Amino acid sequence: MSHPIVRFAPSPTGRIHIGNARPALLNFLFARKYHGEFILRFDDTDLERSKEEYAASIEVDLAWLGITPDRTLRQSQRFALYREAAEVLRSKGRLYPCYETAEELDRKRKRQQARGLPPIYDRAALALSEADRAKLEAEGRRPHWRFKLDPGIARWDDLIRGESHIDAASLSDPILLREDGSYLYTLPSVVDDIDCKITHVIRGEDHVTNTAVQIQLFEALAGHGHVPVFGHHNLLSSASGEGFSKRTGSLSIGSLRDQGFESLAVAAAAVLTGSSVAVHPVKSLDELVAGFDLASLSRTQARFDPAELANLSARTLHQLDFETVRDRLAAHDITGYKAKAFWEAVRGNLTVFLDCIDWWRVVEGEIPPVTEDTAFLDLAKNNLPEEPWDEKAWSSWTGRLKDQTGRKGKALFHPLRLALTGRETGPELAALLPLIGRLKATARLSGHVA
C-alpha cells in the first residue's frame, strides 16, 4: 500500500467520547502503519452549533491520545468549493429543487408506511414546471436541493465487511442543501475527500448506507477513478449495548483524562475492543501500530465496560518504564537521584498516576506518626542497620528482628509498615526502605513526625 491518505472528521458541536476515539485511532494507526497521511478535518458547516471551544478541546483530546495530525482543515473556510460543486451537479441535472415542508414530507412517509411501502421520496419535485416553482416561491417557499440518484446497485469491497452492495432504489434522493442554503454533511464531505485526495475512508458501520450515495457523488464530481476505498468498523457501545453520544459526559475523553485513566489504556480499549485481539496493556502507540490490522475487527457489536478500563489503566501504568514517565514525574517535583528507584518501587501499587504523589511524600516528606506495639518498634529502631542501604537492608533487618522476637508474618511486618509509611499496604518495603533512609526511619519508629 503506497502512501494512503485518511481523515478523521468530527463536528465541533460537543466533546468527543470513547466512541469517537475509535475511528480517530483506527485512521491514525492505519496512516502510520502504511506510512501515509492523517488529516484532521472539522466538519463545522453548522455555524450555529459549531463552537471554537469544542474544536480546541478535540485537538487537546487527540493530542492526549497521541494522535498528531499531518494537516488540519475546517469546512467553514471552504464554502467556495462546495458552491462550485453544487453548480457542477446542477449543470449535470443531478441537483434539483424541492419545496415540500417537513410536515408535508412526514405525511408522505406515513402514507407510504401505511401502504406497506418503504418511505422513499417520490421525486414529485421533478414534475414541477418553472411556473410551478415560481408560484411556490412567490408564496414564500424556499427550495431545499436533492441529489438525483442514478438507478443501479452500488458495490464496493469493504476493508472490514468484505464485498458490500446497496441498491439505489432503496434510498431517497438525499438532501444536500437546506432551504437557508446551508450544507448537510454529505456534499462537503465528498468535496473535501476529492480535494484532499483521500484514498481510504475508515468510519463506523452507521455510515454504510451513506456509502451508496457518496459513491455516486464521487463519480458525478470527479469520475470513476476517484472513489476511495471504504472500511466500516463496528461501533463501540456500552456494556448494556447502548450507543454513546456527546451527551455521555462521563465517557468523554476529557472526563476519562480527568479521572486519571492512562491515555494508552484508553487507546488500547478503543482500538482492541470488538476485535479478535484481546484487550491488553501497551507501552506505546507504536505497539498498537505494529499489531494493527483492520481485518481483526469483528462484525458484532463492540461492548465497552468502563470498569474494565480502570483495570486496564492500572495494568498499563504498572509496566511503564521510568523514561516514559520522567517528565510527568518532574511536573510534580519528583526528581533527583531517587526518582528512578522510586518509580520502579511504587508503580506496581498505583491505581492512577497521581497516587505516586502520596508515595513520594512517604519517601521525601513528612507523615503523621502511626505506631503500634511501641516496645517492638523501639527494638526495631535499635536494630536498624547502618547505611548505606540497598534492597538487602530490609531482609537483613527483619531477619534479625525475627531471630530476637520469634515474630513472623503479619506480626513482624505490619507494625513496621505502619510506622514507616503510615499505610496498611503498599509497595515492597525492601524497595522503599533505602529511599526513606535511616534518619526518617529512626524518627518514625520513635513516633515522631518525619
From Swiss-Prot:
Signal peptide: none
Keywords: Aminoacyl-tRNA synthetase, ATP-binding, Cytoplasm, Ligase, Nucleotide-binding, Protein biosynthesis
Residue ranges annotated as motif 'KMSKS' region: 243-247
GO CC, any one term: cytoplasm
Cellular localization per UniProt: Cytoplasm
Binding site for ATP: K246
Annotated PROSITE patterns: AA_TRNA_LIGASE_I
SUPFAM superfamilies, per database record: An anticodon-binding domain of class I aminoacyl-tRNA synthetases, Nucleotidylyl transferase
Main location as per UniProt: cytoplasm
Catalytic activity line of the entry: tRNA(Glu) + L-glutamate + ATP = L-glutamyl-tRNA(Glu) + AMP + diphosphate
EC id: 6.1.1.17
Motif ('HIGH' region): 10-20
Keyword Protein transport included in the entry's annotation: no
Family: Belongs to the class-I aminoacyl-tRNA synthetase family. Glutamate--tRNA ligase type 1 subfamily.
HAMAP family given in the database record: Glu_tRNA_synth_type1
NCBIfam families in the record: gltX_bact
Subunit structure: Monomer.
Purpose: Catalyzes the attachment of glutamate to tRNA(Glu) in a two-step reaction: glutamate is first activated by ATP to form Glu-AMP and then transferred to the acceptor end of tRNA(Glu).
Name of the protein this chain belongs to: Glutamate--tRNA ligase 2
Gene designation per UniProt: gltX2
